[in-house]
Amino acid sequence: MTTALQQPSLSSQCMAEFLGTALLIFFGTGCVAALKVGGASFGLWEISIIWGVGVSMAIYLTAGVSGAHLNPAVSIALSIFADFEKRKLPFYILAQIAGAFCGALLVYTLYSNLFFDYEQTHHMVRGTQASLELASVFSTFPNPALTTAQAFLVEVIITAILMGVIMSLTDDNNGLPKGPLAPLLIGLLIAVIGSSMGPLTGFAMNPARDFGPKLMTFFAGWGEISFTGGRDIPYFLIPVFAPIVGACLGAAAYRGLIARHLPSALPATKDAAPAIDGKPRTS
């Protein structure tokens, strides 16, 4: 006899999404803060690895309660191409954005004296173009050489790759079951994407990861430039909408190009059903 497990409430799932997203932002932006104002010495690969491990730890923390989406783009894609309940979607997204905001706020609070010292030493005024150097500790801004359209395309492509591989790693029909290794492999995937494409857009791939910290820097004194990135258009819209488009494309591509072609077990027929002695029955 099997015992049915009680499913977590929606409020518990949202709390898990809040905590998981806050944790990954805490580790990721904390690493960048250490580099920018703390005197640490990290290369691109080390930063990408820390972001990836932070995501892995957040997944391990929350997967059993909420499924560890930790990303509105993932939640939206799963609501369209998987069995995630659409009624939960707005609550998950709000929890993820709030978690990202609080994770960034916690890092800012802990490093605040170092931020002030850096600004005084470099005669930096918040809200100016120069202050984007420190605002980028918390959220992403594109390489100046990229147009806005190119930045949008980069985020679409890398998020599509992220979503497609996430679906493959969590699909037990696709090769050997990944089980407890899946979060580590997802973290490694993020590190690989970050180390290869990070210099272009900062590899947001997550609307909450970018918008929540941008909101925090807006209130912390950076103001409007937090959202525009010093461009003529509100750049914050790019890492909000491009990952959503990319995640949906990645999920659709996995479903259409990979999942539908995976071998699946055929239902047993009467003629093929084994007898007690192990030999097949014949009609």
Residue ranges and their predicted role:
Residues 1-283:
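Membrane-interface helix-loop junctions and terminal tails of multi-pass membrane proteins
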